[in-house]
Curated annotation (Swiss-Prot):
It comes from Pasteurella multocida (strain Pm70). It holds the Pfam family SfsA. NCBIfam families: sfsA (TIGR00230). The lineage of its organism: Bacteria, Pseudomonadati, Pseudomonadota, Gammaproteobacteria, Pasteurellales. This is Sugar fermentation stimulation protein homolog. GO terms for molecular function: DNA binding.
Length: 240
């Protein structure tokens, strides 16, 4: 996935969930939009290098968007979680996700379920069961272990209940954890943050819901990040 042209700055603070103040190299302070409403644990500390994009839209109050954080250990993380679906769609179209490569039709944002939900992707193929794919962003990493969630997620819990119901109806159901961070080589649920999500995921696995986590990789040109891609499936080390 190609990233928009990016410029770097130093993070001063994030506030009101959607805003952040950053300092440019010339000392100017700029307020930028933050699309990530989560806790952003470990990827939004004062002093971090942030990479932001610019929009020419006349309707936006804040034309700049926080896209990436360059961590003090050198790792990169995409904090714009809107990118996770774009990234996953590209991987599906390119048949990079082997467990799902047999599907030919990819339908985004389809209404489904009993709790007024939308599935990120509904996959269809001749002679194949419909496959419901829910995408989650992996931005939290500790000791090279990618984790989700970074805050209690009642929405994520709802999605697991919906996937369990779809599986019980004879469909395929998948939770896909997309690596927006390039510093992990295995994945688990952050049960210490959201034990209910961990409990529901274990229940989902027992019911036959599939779990896949893919590592992320950034490409650079002239030391600027230019692209993000999913490279390979990493081990899920949670309980099964």
């Amino acid at each position: 996935m190609q990233l928009p042209p990016l410029q770097s700055a130093t993070l001063i603070r994030r506030y009101k969930r959607f805003l952040a103040d950053v300092q440019l190299d010339n000392g100017e302070v700029l307020t930028i939009h933050c699309a990530n409403t989560g806790a952003m644990t470990g990827c939004g500390e004062a002093g971090d290098i942030v990479w932001y994009s610019h929009s020419d839209s006349q309707t936006r109050k804040y034309p700049h968007s926080w896209e990436l954080t360059e961590l003090k250990n050198g790792n990169m993380v995409c904090i714009n979680t809107h990118r996770s679906n774009q990234l996953t769609l590209e991987a599906l179209q390119n048949k990079q996700i082997k467990a799902l490569a047999m599907y030919e039709q990819i339908l985004p944002e389809v209404k489904y379920g009993e709790e007024n939900s939308r599935i990120d992707f509904l996959l269809k193929g001749d002679g194949l069961p419909d496959c419901y794919v829910e995408v989650k962003s992996v931005t939290l990493v500790k000791n090279t272990i990618g984790m989700f969630p970074d805050a209690v997620t009642t929405r994520g819990q709802k999605h697991l209940r919906e996937l369990i119901a779809m599986k019980k109806r004879g469909h395929r159901a998948v939770v896909f954890f997309a690596g927006l961070h390039n510093g992990f080589d295995c994945f688990k649920v952050a049960e210490y943050i959201d034990p209910e999500y961990d409990k529901l995921l274990q229940e989902a696995i027992q019911e036959g819901v599939e779990v896949y986590a893919y590592a992320g990789k950034f490409d650079f040109s002239d030391k600027k990040p230019t692209a993000l891609s999913l490279t390979h499936c990493v081990p899920y080390i949670g309980k099964k």
